[in-house]
């Protein structure tokens, strides 16, 4: 009987001292990736029927040299109309990810221009397709 109690006590002590989670901590929240993919699917599925003019960042976006990321996300979010307002959450989540986990991008020379809504949506698709899912560390190529 005492052997059973000793074995039970050993199991309890061992289970209490065991790690409660994986020793590998996840440092990259990937919710923004799913949000970007969902936004791209919605953009592909919805026809552009508005003839409004909206503002976009006129500087060309390049994944090699990220500039105006927060400005672009803010302007895209503000420019959404109609059914496309469903994308606000995805853009907000992406902005939050980049603001929290990535080095700041230059935001000073972010000139804007007025364009058609169809061109605005095309610019948004291109931006979401080209934006890297993962941050580059300073000095990383």
From Swiss-Prot:
It comes from Mus musculus (Mouse). GO terms for biological process: cell population proliferation; cell surface receptor signaling pathway via JAK-STAT; cellular response to granulocyte macrophage colony-stimulating factor stimulus; embryonic placenta development; granulocyte-macrophage colony-stimulating factor signaling pathway; immune response; macrophage differentiation; monocyte differentiation. Cytokine that stimulates the growth and differentiation of hematopoietic precursor cells from various lineages, including granulocytes, macrophages, eosinophils and erythrocytes. The keyword Secreted applies. Monomer. The signaling GM-CSF receptor complex is a dodecamer of two head-to-head hexamers of two alpha, two beta, and two ligand subunits. SUPFAM superfamilies: 4-helical cytokines. Changing residue 124 to P: 5500-fold reduction in bioactivity. Glycans are attached at residues 22, 27, 83, 92. The keyword Glycoprotein applies. Changing residue 80 to P: 450-fold reduction in bioactivity. Residues 1-17 form the signal peptide. InterPro entries: 4_helix_cytokine-like_core (IPR009079), GM_colony-stim-fac (IPR000773). This is Granulocyte-macrophage colony-stimulating factor. The gene is Csf2. Disulfide bonds join 68-110, 102-135. One of its GO terms (molecular function) is growth factor activity. SMART domains: CSF2. Changing residue 73 to P: 25-fold reduction in bioactivity.
